[in-house]
Amino acid sequence: MVRDEDLDNLIKNLPFLIRQNINQHPSKQKLIEIVIDLGRRPEARFTTGPEYLSQKVISWQDINHFTKRISKFSNDNRAGIERTLHRISCIRNRQFLINGLTCRIGRAIFGTISSVRDLLESQQSILLLGKPGVGKTTIIREIARVLSDEMEKRVVIVDTSNEIAGDSDIPHSAIGRARRMQVATTDLQHQIMIEAVENHMPQVIVIDEIGTELEALAARTIAEKGVQLVGTTHGNCLENLIKNPPLSDLIGGIQSVTLSDDEAKRRGTQKSIIERKAYPAFQIAIEINTENSWTIHEDIKSSIDLLLRKSFTGTQVRELFLDKRTFIKYKKLQIDTFTLLKDSNSLKIQTINRSNNWFTRSQKSLFYFQNSKAKKCFIFIYSLPSNLISEILNKLKFQYVLTKELQKSSLIVGSKVSLNQNFKLKKLAQQCSIPVYSVNKENIYQIISLVKLFK
């Protein structure tokens, strides 16, 4: 990874005592932000922890010295330094006078997205989730550069606070060939998003910090027009978006549905349930846990549906090491049994993620996979002729072992009617995280199509 920090352009504008101490500090390159509050000692926050920069407290003169050397603060109390990525935010008193400053270091880090480059090449819309300060803006800046320079796409950035491309009319070189549209006030971000699509023919729209209902609706409108979206929002995981009413439209929105008595009994749930309302604006979600560890949801639609049914989703965790190796770890997949009790046509979509089934995980790949100890598939057959299934599996040269112990099985195969009636089997399958496959009839053609799904 290559870093471009422009730290000197920020430090030279600070008061003398702060400037001197930072320049002499051994952890200068690990600086995250500088906090300047009236009547308090200046504080520097590093990746290793906070430290005071001076024994002297900050005065009005120190604050005025700094604010005169930066750009004017906008309506969201943010400012910057010309041709840099640093952000300065202010705190005001009741008379609207500045009595506190937060100087956040902006860094262009090249090579941060090498572990998810395959997701960018899929041309699907990507949503990045993370806590404040985890590095979402740095990542989205690098995504814009890779899409515009290396993949040669028409990229337009909607830069609300001038954080992505810097505080200048000339965009920072870190965004490559991507174009940047500035926003006069934060209230107009959703209008600029629509304007970018209508006026500038982009293939990709990059948006930082989607935070209001209007912006979420604008994102959905852009997605319906066939433009690839790359956006960020605050939140630890997808569940936070479900519980956040203004942002739930990003993942399709949620609604309360009342089921009939028969349907509720078939599903084994209560009559009033929560379901996804529409298609999500984004197809892929990336949860940024730490700087080098990200959780990937390759199909947001399926993940949201399973979360609403209180089931675990099949996700992957990607870790990037210093030697540029990517380690991919698949989490265990646990799905409610009723979602699997579909006919064999819809089963291909409803059940297991293609990259999470046991067969794929047992193959050799460019990456490292966990949960791949079993080289043979242990099949538990319920209310179907085992001789017929064995014959089909042998003809298809499928490595398998028929087992009568449910807890040792890799998957369960049975008839739809019998599985619907056996609630105990459903519960055990859910507790043991065992996927369930079903067929409507004991038909050789249905069983063959079902077995082909295992591959």
From Swiss-Prot:
Query: Carries keyword Plastid?
Result: yes
Classification via CDD domains: AAA
Q: Which SMART domains match?
A: AAA
Q: From the UniProt record, which GO molecular function terms apply?
A: ATP binding; ATP hydrolysis activity
Q: Where in the cell is it found?
A: Plastid, Chloroplast
| Recorded coiled-coil stretches | none
InterPro entries per the record? AAA+_ATPase, P-loop_NTPase, Spore_III_AA_AAA+_ATPase
Top-rank taxon, per record: Eukaryota
Q: Looking at the keywords, is Plastid present?
A: yes
What are the annotated GO cellular component locations? chloroplast
Summarize where ATP binds, as residue positions: 130-137
- Kindly state which keywords UniProt assigns to this record, in alphabetical order: ATP-binding, Chloroplast, Nucleotide-binding, Plastid
Q: Which family does it belong to?
A: Belongs to the ycf45 family.
User: What name does UniProt use for this protein?
Assistant: Uncharacterized protein ycf45
